[in-house]
């Protein structure tokens, strides 16, 4: 059996070496000292006293008699026709922030958007979401949002701003002075039309698109190879073999929500299927995608180009063609080439490189493998990335030369995330006319002379074409909370046109989209149907012929074949899965979401290989100085390539709300070229120690057989491979299993489908009002997440296998937590749910101590203003402010200080589903009720249902030979089970 470990400390020193106490062991002075660490001393309160007294039953009973103030709800006097109190309304819409896109449903309660769900009708995202999509609803209630137009620090009325802007635009137009409209990639047909009209009226305005995480190399390579600029449509669900060079396509590359669904579709083993795709990842840093690979080859960034050139040589050699350069043979690459060749037309090679030469060679490899038209489509393109890096470089040159006299920015922050951000900042200060059109403050808007604040996307109308002929609409779920106006409406207003952008969209659709269909006799019917569904995906036949236009590949191969003689450390920058390029740095849900691989939150850090750390005598938490420019804490990451280090971008924001300000370090400026890495990096140990908020060692289950796995070949021979002990444990008891006459709710997690992305965790937080506790409390193991995604390493610490496992309350039918609660606050329902009576809980924490799965969470403070006692409040992210409390789900009780909470299997959704079925006089249908984690999951890894329904999908999965329960040997009889992880080690 494999040995599984969560950290290098655990691997080397054993289970008990890893701290897991929410409070430290020791004498009274040591215990009290934790309250003073990093905080001002404060008076003890009643809960502190109970903590130190072991929460005796007698004292707790006395304290529980305290009363809270009464708060009254105010009903509607005249109910709006479309609103029924207590019933949610859903609006089909779209999430679009920079390069992130998702077709969504907005859930509103009494006019408040409170939750984002995926749109199952979308042919792009297919109902899946990401952690950023789920967390975006909280940004609507961000207290740092701009609330009105401004000139400098002076508040303006919109009429005053419009007059000022028109005057400046006309002045610059008459003088024929250049103005730049700087935006992120725009893939809204109507917005593009508005911008084109704006430029037609002001011909001195030049439109430039800028992406901080750009796909410029892909776009240029496709134009060079096929004569069509753009990003190809990748189909991982058609690929039997995938080779990825540093492309984190499950984490941050292009469109992860779509990629995850496609990728896991080829990894599911159900309905008798025994075939899986084979995935090889060649990379420097252990990424989310690399963590899911069947085989991973750690290499330095400088070595990857040579390996790609070698792979191309091997492929054309197999094709019987003449090779361009004589390169050193690599055994791994030769075998990969043979495996790819045996999967011609059903393979896919991708690269995350920003080097155009690399992308040209990758295109050539895929063309030789006959993948175009199958796993790759040039005629169907991804439109969320359009920017050309050279355009932004030209803008900076024009600013510095004085040629550029005006700038209008929308949705970008180059002062922070552009490589030459400091130069951009200095040049921007010299421009007379500068106008920002953003919803929140950032480093760039702070330097602009004028501000026209934009709406949040949940307050906006828009349309999108994320992929060729895949259209979607955005509609608001609430009226603007502040005195803001959409970017498009502002442009229309400055043109002297009707500023109603909705009318503009409808006119554009009637002219361009309506003729693409024949199902609806008039535009009104077509529009209403499309608005209701949120998408329009016409069938349009492609006429593009994919021909590879480059005939001489010699220069490209030679460019890649140059061996970089770099023996020093190389630095690689990567995009954070949680906060991306920094646009969502002020979102506390995302800041507190642990990185899927390192399990660290509230910081960025320097990933160092175990061998490098040993040589330099570094440990996790040591602070190093990088090239005498920035200081960063070290994290020793298993699987990190030797002589390489990596750090996430998006951190170190200086101008934003209180949540994201000064969290981590900005490293964007370190990369001063188009290369993907920085060579010859010097690290100097400072002697300082930094506390990282790391959750990977919290809530340990003491090294027992938690993850079960097997190889594909073993599984084909024996479907119970890796799960042989299940049958013995399943029938070990002499007692009869509990019976539930009506429903018995349960859940299955397919470990083959779970990639560890974290969407489920944020969805649960949004649905169930799970509080944010802040970095200091996370360090104390006080985090509150109801569902954690455990990450396990196994094998060699220098290149380990990785397993992800979502763990929530297991809803045991023989629950150890229930019989130790002195007041029966936790008990079992008649439908198999382990439920909590919050107002009965007195906070002894006996249940948490007795839970073998460590899934119960204790409220050390009042994080969401659940009671009226000021001393109980602990507000790290303004979550107690009334504006942010608008995001709370009224169907879920907010918990007060001193109360235990945990996963309820979304009992509020179960009750709603049962009531709907009762009203309609029928039984609950299988799949009708979905938990928040299940609905958010882009891979469909979670299945919820009724264990009493023998025809349900859940029961079919629990009947699988791969099905097992956590810690079956202690006979807790969980209602949550798992399907063993199967790895395809050979193609």
Label each PLM-derived region with a short phrase.
Residues 234-241, 273, 277, 281, ...:
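Domain-level signature for respiratory redox metalloenzymes
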């Amino acid at each position: 059996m494999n040995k599984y470990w969560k950290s290098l400390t655990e691997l080397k020193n054993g289970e008990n070496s890893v701290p897991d106490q929410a409070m430290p062991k020791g004498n009274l002075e040591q215990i009290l000292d934790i309250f003073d660490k990093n905080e001002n001393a404060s008076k003890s309160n009643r809960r502190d006293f109970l903590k130190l007294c072991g929460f005796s039953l007698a004292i707790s009973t006395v304290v529980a008699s305290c009363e809270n103030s009464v708060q009254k709800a105010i009903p509607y006097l005249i109910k709006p026709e479309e609103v029924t109190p207590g019933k949610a309304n859903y609006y089909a819409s779209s999430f679009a922030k920079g390069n992130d896109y998702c077709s969504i449903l907005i859930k509103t309660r009494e006019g408040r958007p409170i939750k984002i769900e995926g749109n199952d009708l979308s042919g792009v995202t297919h109902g899946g979401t990401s952690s950023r999509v789920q967390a975006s609803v909280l940004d609507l209630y961000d207290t740092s949002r701009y609330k009105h137009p401004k000139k400098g620090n002076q508040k303006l009325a919109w009429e005053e701003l419009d007059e000022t802007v028109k005057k400046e635009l006309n002045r610059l137009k008459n003088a024929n002075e250049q103005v730049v409209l700087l935006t992120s990639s725009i893939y809204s047909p109507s917005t593009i039309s508005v911008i084109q009209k704006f430029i037609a009226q002001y011909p001195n305005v030049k439109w430039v698109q800028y992406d901080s995480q750009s796909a410029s190399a892909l776009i240029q390579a496709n134009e060079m190879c096929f004569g069509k600029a753009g990003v190809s449509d990748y189909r991982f669900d058609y690929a039997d073999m995938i080779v990825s060079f540093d492309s984190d396509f499950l984490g941050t590359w292009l469109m992860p929500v779509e990629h995850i669904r496609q990728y896991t579709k080829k990894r599911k083993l159900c309905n008798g299927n025994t075939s899986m795709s084979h995935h090889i990842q060649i990379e420097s840093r252990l990424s989310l995608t690399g963590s899911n690979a069947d085989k991973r080859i750690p290499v330095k960034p400088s070595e990857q180009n040579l390996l790609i050139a070698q792979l191309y040589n091997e492929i054309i050699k197999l094709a019987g063609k003449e090779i361009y350069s004589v390169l050193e043979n690599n055994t791994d690459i030769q075998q990969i080439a043979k495996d790819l060749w045996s999967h011609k037309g059903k393979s896919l090679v991708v690269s995350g490189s920003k080097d155009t030469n690399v992308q040209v060679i990758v295109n050539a490899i895929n063309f030789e493998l006959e993948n175009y038209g199958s796993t790759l489509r040039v005629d169907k393109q991804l439109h969320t990335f359009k920017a050309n890096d050279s355009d932004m470089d030209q803008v900076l040159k024009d600013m510095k030369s004085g040629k550029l006299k005006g700038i209008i920015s929308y949705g970008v922050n180059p002062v922070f995330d552009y490589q030459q951000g400091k130069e951009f900042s200095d040049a921007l200060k010299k421009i007379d006319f500068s106008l920002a059109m953003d919803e929140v403050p950032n480093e760039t808007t702070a330097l602009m002379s004028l501000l026209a604040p934009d709406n949040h996307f949940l307050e906006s109308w828009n349309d999108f074409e994320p992929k060729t002929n895949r259209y979607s609409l955005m509609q608001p779920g609430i009226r603007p909370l502040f005195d803001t106006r959409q970017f498009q409406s502002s442009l229309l207003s400055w043109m002297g046109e009707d500023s109603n952008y909705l009318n503009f969209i409808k006119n554009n659709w009637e002219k361009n989209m309506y003729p693409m269909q024949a199902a609806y006799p008039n535009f009104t019917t077509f529009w209403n149907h499309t608005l209701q569904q949120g998408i329009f995906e016409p069938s349009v036949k492609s006429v593009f012929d994919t021909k590879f236009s480059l005939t001489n590949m010699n220069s490209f191969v030679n460019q890649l074949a140059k061996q970089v003689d770099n023996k020093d450390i190389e630095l690689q920058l990567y995009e954070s899965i949680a906060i991306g390029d920094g646009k969502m740095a002020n979102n506390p849900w995302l800041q507190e979401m642990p990185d899927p691989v390192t399990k660290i939150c509230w910081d960025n850090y320097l990933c160092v290989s175990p061998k490098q750390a040993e040589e330099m005598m570094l440990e996790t938490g040591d602070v190093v100085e990088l090239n005498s420019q920035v200081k960063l804490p070290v994290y020793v990451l298993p699987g990190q390539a030797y002589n390489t280090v990596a750090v996430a971008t998006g951190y170190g924001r200086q101008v934003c709300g209180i949540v994201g300000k000064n969290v981590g370090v900005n490293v964007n400026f370190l990369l001063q070229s188009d290369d993907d890495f920085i060579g010859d990096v010097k690290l100097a140990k400072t002697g300082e120690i930094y506390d990282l908020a790391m959750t990977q060692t919290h809530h340990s289950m003491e090294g027992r057989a938690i993850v079960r796995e097997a190889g594909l070949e073993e599984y084909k021979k024996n479907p119970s491979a890796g799960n042989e002990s299940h049958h013995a444990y399943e029938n070990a008891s002499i007692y009869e299993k509990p019976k539930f006459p009506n429903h018995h709710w349960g859940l299955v997690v397919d470990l083959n489908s779970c990639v560890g992305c974290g969407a489920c965790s944020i969805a649960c937080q949004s649905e169930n009002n799970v509080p944010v506790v802040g970095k200091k409390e996370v360090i104390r193991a006080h985090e509150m997440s109801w569902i954690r995604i455990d990450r396990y390493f196994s094998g060699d610490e220098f290149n380990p296998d990785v397993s992800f496992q979502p763990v929530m309350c297991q809803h045991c039918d023989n629950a150890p937590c229930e019989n130790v609660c002195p007041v029966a606050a936790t008990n079992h329902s008649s439908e198999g749910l382990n439920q909590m009576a919050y107002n009965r809980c007195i906070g002894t924490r006996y249940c948490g101590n007795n839970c073998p799965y460590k899934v119960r969470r204790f409220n050390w403070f009042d994080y969401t203003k659940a009671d009226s006692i000021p001393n109980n409040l602990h507000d790290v992210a303004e979550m107690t402010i009334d504006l942010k409390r608008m995001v709370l789900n009224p169907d879920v009780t907010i918990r007060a200080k001193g109360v235990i909470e945990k996963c309820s299997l979304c009992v509020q959704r179960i009750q709603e589903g049962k009531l709907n079925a009762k009203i309609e006089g029928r039984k609950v249908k299988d799949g009708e009720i979905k938990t928040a984690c299940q609905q958010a999951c882009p891979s469909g890894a979670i299945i919820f249902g009724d264990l009493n329904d023998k025809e349900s999908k859940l029961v079919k999965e629990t009947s699988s030979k791969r099905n097992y329960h956590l810690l079956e040997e202690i006979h807790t009889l969980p209602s949550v089970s798992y399907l063993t992880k199967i790895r395809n080690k050979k193609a």
